[in-house]
């Protein structure tokens, strides 16, 4: 029996609970192992094979169908114009959401799952972290305390990158960011070579503006959502785990936090959340949720409990 999503009157969304959404998997086989899922997890996340089967396999099926529809539309346009098939136009997916909500894990899972479809095996993933202005430039502009806010990104470079990929350019380079050094890696790039699908993951990728924005180039978009108080808890928990791991690496930008006791670490993390990440979420990220093609709503256990899909 097909699921019947709850659809509020005059809402542009179809609203599924987890049981309804998992039925849309439509007998798709599980293509990941537990080992692969563990490797794809973010810090502090509980994602397992059940989450993949019930949430991400249906989502990968939906995107697969949309990719096929986009290819048919391209073919129809070529028929109308009487032109020969041109270079395949990559299908571009945006993945947005707050810091610590799990959007990076969602993007990695989608990359791996979509690669398993024979019709679009080349799936590239780029994060917008590499398009943050270098640390020296942020200092020059007085933006170090606004890192992660829209103005801290080289929006022109990001737009040019996605435009070049979508236009079929043979090779396009994206800057690489180091979370250890908390800065771009000079001279290091990720090269994208005419993928079937490009996933662009970042805090502010769904933002709009008076001129063309990267979100205008997306064929599909996902917003990873959760209650603000849950995200704050996850952020603090992640900070404590990073204090014991990444902050201790040689050259770590945040090495001065590595030897803090729990009470002091929690106080620092809460201050960072309340002064930087929460304002960015409220002012810039959360307002873009309405633009997403699909919203994954997580519960306090970090697992998806509801899915909202745009009808139009």
Curated annotation (Swiss-Prot):
Source species taxonomy: Bacteria, Bacillati, Actinomycetota, Actinomycetes, Mycobacteriales
GO CC, alphabetical: cytoplasm
Class in the EC hierarchy, top level: transferase
InterPro entries assigned: P-loop_NTPase, PanK, PRK/URK
Gene name as annotated: coaA
Record's keyword annotation contains Aminoacyl-tRNA synthetase: no
Gene Ontology terms for molecular function: ATP binding; pantothenate kinase activity
Name of the protein in question: Pantothenate kinase
Naturally occurring in which organism (per UniProt): Corynebacterium glutamicum (strain ATCC 13032 / DSM 20300 / JCM 1318 / BCRC 11384 / CCUG 27702 / LMG 3730 / NBRC 12168 / NCIMB 10025 / NRRL B-2784 / 534)
Pfam families: PRK
Annotated localization: Cytoplasm
Cytoplasm among keywords: yes
Domain of life: Bacteria
